[in-house]
Amino acid sequence: MSLQFVLGPAKMDHRRTMVAQLVATLMAKPQDQFFYLVPNHIKFDTEVDVLNRLAQAFGQPDLYAQTQVQVFSFTRLAWYLMKNEAAYQVPRLSAAGIDMLLYRILQRHADELRLFGGEISQTGFVTQLAREINELQTANLQPEDVVQLAANAQAGDLQAKLHDLAIVYKDFVAATADKYLKPADILVQLNAYLRRQDLHGTHVYVELAGFAQLPAQEQGIVTTMLEQGADVTISLMLDHKVVDRAPENGTLFYQSGRLYYRLYQYARIRQIPVSQDIYAETPRVAPGLVALDDFWRGQPQAATGYEEPNTNVHLFRTDSRQTELAQVGRMIRAMVAKKHADPADDYHYRDFLIMTRHLDAYQTMLAPTFHELEIPYFVDLQRSMADHPLVELINALFDIDAQQYQYRDVMRVLKTELLMPNINGQPMDRQAYRQAVDLTENFILKSGYHGQRWVQREDWQYFQLTEGDAGVETDQNAEISRQINLIHHFVAETLPPFFKKMRQAPDGKAAVTLLVNFLTSQGVTDQLLAWRDQALDRQDVRAAAEPEQTWQTFCGMLDEYVTILGAEPFEITDFLALLQAGFEGASYSQIPSTLDQVLISESGMVQSQDHKVVFMVGATDLVMPDRIMTNNLLSDVDKENLQLTLSSLDGDHYLNDSAVVQLGDESCLNYLAFLSARRHLFFSAPLKDDQETDLNWSNYVRRIQRQFNLREHTYLGTPDPTNADARPFVGTKRRTISHVIQVYRDVLTTNTDRNRVGAPLQPAPVWVWLRQQLTRDPQFGELARQLMAGLSYRNQPVKLTPASVEALYGHQIYTSISKLEEFYRNQYAYFLKYGLKLRERDVFELSAASTGEFFHAVLDGLIKALRSDQIPLAQASDQQLGQYLETVTRQILDQPQFTILTSSNRMAYLQRQLINTVRQIAFAIRNQSKLSAAEPKQTEILFGNVGKEHGLKALDFQIDATHSVHVRGKIDRLDQIQVADQSYLGIVDYKSSQHKFDFQEAYYGLAMQMLTYLDAVLHNEQALVGSDQAAVKLAGALYMHIQNPTLKPKDIQGGFEAALLKKNKYKGILLDDPQLLEHLDSELQQGNGTSKVYPFARKKDGSYSGGRAASLVTNDQLERLLQHNSQLIIAAAEAIFAGEIQLNPIRLNDKTTALQYSPYLSIMQFDAMLAENAYRDLPPLSAKQVLDLLKTQKGGENHE
């Protein structure tokens, strides 16, 4: 029985000293039992290393076996000693099972709990409580100890927490005692077992040199071994003994010094012999790292700086985290590739350790970076199962029932690809399934199907209405309907019966049985196994293990649920909460795919000390030292208040350290990380984070840099073409070619810069050589040449061939004028939208087009109903108008396209708003009619053909002998004004936003609608007014803003009706004909002023003015506008038939562009910085300039 300490700083080889002690004792006492204990995290590596050292010591390097020496972690020691003990055979209780049990306890004692009762339903609380219970157990505190702590605490939150903890903890211990074995119980059982053993002749070596702490339970194991006669040797990272007084927090070796002090005092009080301390004296690290160790510990020999740089410590900065990882990878490849005279000096991937304080910032970059560099790696962090598709399937499955088949929930289930239909007894082909699900998703987004629609027996009918649709179902639509109904009926036939049985389940056991049987019968387990096999085929061992581990964890949680809650009524909400908490606490068992791979970890974790090279990435002042945050039920203040009471209890009781203590340990934690390296230590940090915020070196790194006169290197993500040192950018062939391309693109961009002066830029010879080598490589050359060819790529569409034009458009174009406006905005957008017919998928929503259709339909129906009953609009009373409106609106809302307005409470509210708006507009039009001689003659007048609808004659233009264009459209309203023998026709277009006639846009072909409609009226004059009528004149084209205006107090000072008339005033152009204008507004016939209805004013001299909007045009001016509009139509058709598809978006007035709301940006890849991509800037023109230009232009001359 004795206690022995092996001390020394991190630079020393503690294990060498420990193994030497073990060998000496083993030789002297070969029949004794030897245990070498290390943290579980590094057990395997330590076991291999210790056995290798023993083999060397006994002269058997090639083949060595040892039965008397066992290398274990504490929990593995428990298995070894107690595997046949009854106490060790009881069922294990996982983290999920613990959560379930605590959840039931909380519910049972809800009325007794002062604080915890109201927290039961809070997400994460049960898991947080489980952590607190585990901390109490590892601190060797029993329920009666917590009761005593509560009794001694002052009234307040702490006492209430301890009161609740005592109730829950007591019930928890009673519920698990002799029934379940919890993780914390294993060491309790081991301690009890050891107390019954005679350990004389047992030698225990505890290696703690690589880390600083030993939890209270493990300390209890060590002290029990001492009491039972074992010889215990403990290595500690400590450069001096701590005998008389405990160390102060904040000192470098606080944790190990505190442990030394506690164990020494324990042995001294119990008169257990303490042997003379042994110091590890053999350095295990390179000289430069020895110097770093001395400096960090503040040794006298390190007090002055170094003139020569430290050759074992290096640092560099990069422009981003991505570049930082890439540079680390490049260095690793270079070091592995370099061969030395002595093979023992060569590097393997397993010799490298990459660490940072928190891997989150690098997580998404690891895989692409190291895969591209072809570096095998292993991330030494536990990964939660919470995001596995099986977990998503279960959650979404029950959400479907709870939320009544909402779109997102059904899609969540289908997209897990774990529940799939069977075709002829076999699972559906995955690609065919994905296609069917995608089509179904598009359909329900378009139709708004949800709820009971999913479970109806009737087929869903897919339809797609397009221009020219003759109303006949196509084979393509029938096939899409088949695929959609395959998914629809799979859901309808599979889920409702399952949900019905679950609702009828009498208890938890029955419900869980139904769930497992359902998942198994639906082939979920088969799909998981298929995923495993596919991963194995890819040689992805890690991914292959995940499906089975997740299913086993799931089944284990269900077993525990049945054991703990199986006899109680089944509550789906509670069940899902427990499952989710269980999966969040569950993690995959990490399986390295190869023995030779780079290890990636966090500096807060225990690390093996056999890595030759360590990279400390992300070494910024944000994480070195770290910002310590705690999220425990017992706060740091609570723990501080408990320290005095804890010291009065029997035994050793140590709660987890507070944030203050942990912050004090940061220096030691980083010291251990630095000294994990044996040969080289690299510090790196990005200059900026992802948000372009500047990042600074850690003060730790700055101190080291100053002390050792270290040179800082900076690496950029993009190489300098003129720099002859290409080494930072040379890696795998694929990665190197990407940098070669960057160099040549930079050269190309620089040399094509119009503002550049001087000789052309040339790449450094090394880049020319790299390009030649890569493009001539037998295996890689073809790909390299393809990638390099991208340098000559220009983002310019190629003109269509005549054959392509004919295939897309034929010989005749039937079009609306808005399509040609699109052509003038951007030719390529026209090609995508109307040539290739690309479009965004339809969504079941109330769009601007839908509301416009509603307004048009109601106003059309209202005016037609009044005309049918021979009631002039101006003479309709308020009551009459209201009744007609109500009738027409009801009829319109009954139409299928407006069912969306009854699909939800929100839509019902919007329906009321739409009805109010159209009512206001109807009354506004009636009031306008009272002041004007203009009367609505027709509404919704179609010219040209749309599908099966036939209207007036289209506007037909012959382009050449074989090509023509036919323009169609629909005029919202045609007004007629009869003045003596002269008839005038004017058009009104309803708009849901403010519009005016823009001469500039009309000139450039961006706003041709109104002029085209006027032209259509002229071409269909006889059909509109009859052949017996004298020639009509065009009155003009006006916009009416459909709105329910908000009026301010100042607006209604002149009267409410006058304010509404002003808000609904027409905008557009009118014929500058005094005879016409006089009859448009009766209020101005005898006086002067501005019209309340139309966009003109009458001056005192009786003449008329269009004001700033230049809304009055002469007959000649109108004719020129119409002629120019026709020329634009012809010019657009000529360009389309010629195959023109230029990427030429317009930019108007230096702000408005054709790309602002385009859905095709990702296809066009337009970049104004590229020489070949530029906006087509249209010079601003006033109305006068446009009219003057038209006057001077000759017929057929290009409008630009």
Curated annotation (Swiss-Prot):
Thylakoid keyword on record: no
Any GO BP annotation: double-strand break repair via homologous recombination
Cofactor(s) this protein requires: Mg(2+)
EC assignment: 3.1.-.-
Molecular function, one GO term: double-stranded DNA binding
Quaternary data: Heterodimer of AddA and RexB.
Function description: The heterodimer acts as both an ATP-dependent DNA helicase and an ATP-dependent, dual-direction single-stranded exonuclease. Recognizes the chi site generating a DNA molecule suitable for the initiation of homologous recombination. This subunit has 5' -> 3' nuclease activity but not helicase activity.
PANTHER family: RECBCD ENZYME SUBUNIT RECC (PTHR30591:SF1)
Similarity-based family: Belongs to the helicase family. AddB/RexB type 2 subfamily.
Name of the molecule in the record: ATP-dependent helicase/deoxyribonuclease subunit B
Organism: Lactiplantibacillus plantarum (strain ATCC BAA-793 / NCIMB 8826 / WCFS1) (Lactobacillus plantarum)
